[in-house]
């Protein structure tokens, strides 16, 4: 059983990322549980998605420790995961990138917002880059046609290209392009560098 938490603020794509991934997993034959915890009154309020999936029936969808935590904001406290993927600046108190030696080898720091803006023209595509990276770390490698089938109709082509970009971040040329375009360093885990995407 795999457990993923997506953490952010309202308007950061938490629901789109998690729902797209959940629909994809269902189409791939997995049992899926997706639970949301969010403040519906305020844009910018806490937004969490708890996603559990397995080939067998899911008895308990509660997540104490996730396999992967995608952290797009610092709003949520006390979340634990084996691997955490931070939006750049969230792992430090001053909002700047952490020193490479201060980031555990299982964790990653990626400037999703800047990549979305600089490479695809809108910050919202950074969330699809995050989805692509999440798919690699979770070892979800469906054919492109399966991914396209669950993408929102609006900006389908741009979203697909952003997901592919996220899936290929472990490739040196792709990583370098991302760093040049965003002006920020990208730190990937060894685990993520070894994954191959389709």
What spans do the regions from the language model cover?
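Active-site cofactor/cluster-binding pocket
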Residues: 1-198
């Amino acid at each position: 059983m795999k457990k993923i938490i997506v953490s952010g603020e309202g308007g950061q794509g938490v629901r789109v990322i998690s729902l797209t991934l959940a629909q994809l997993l269902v189409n791939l034959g997995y049992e899926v549980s997706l639970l949301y915890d969010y403040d519906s009154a305020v844009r910018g309020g806490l937004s969490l998605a708890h996603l559990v999936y397995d080939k067998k029936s899911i008895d308990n969808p509660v997540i104490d420790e996730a396999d992967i935590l995608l952290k797009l904001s610092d709003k949520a406290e006390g979340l634990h995961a084996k691997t955490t993927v931070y939006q750049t600046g969230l792992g430090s108190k001053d909002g700047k990138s952490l020193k490479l030696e201060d980031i555990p080898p299982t964790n990653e720091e990626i400037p999703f917002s800047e990549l979305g803006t600089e490479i695809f023209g809108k910050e919202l595509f950074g969330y699809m880059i995050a989805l692509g990276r999440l798919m690699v770390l979770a070892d979800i490698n469906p054919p492109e046609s399966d991914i396209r089938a669950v993408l929102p109709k609006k900006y389908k082509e741009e979203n697909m290209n952003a997901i592919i970009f996220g899936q290929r971040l472990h490739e040196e040329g792709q990583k370098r392009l991302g760093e040049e375009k965003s002006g920020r360093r990208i730190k990937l885990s060894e685990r993520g560098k070894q994954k191959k995407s389709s």
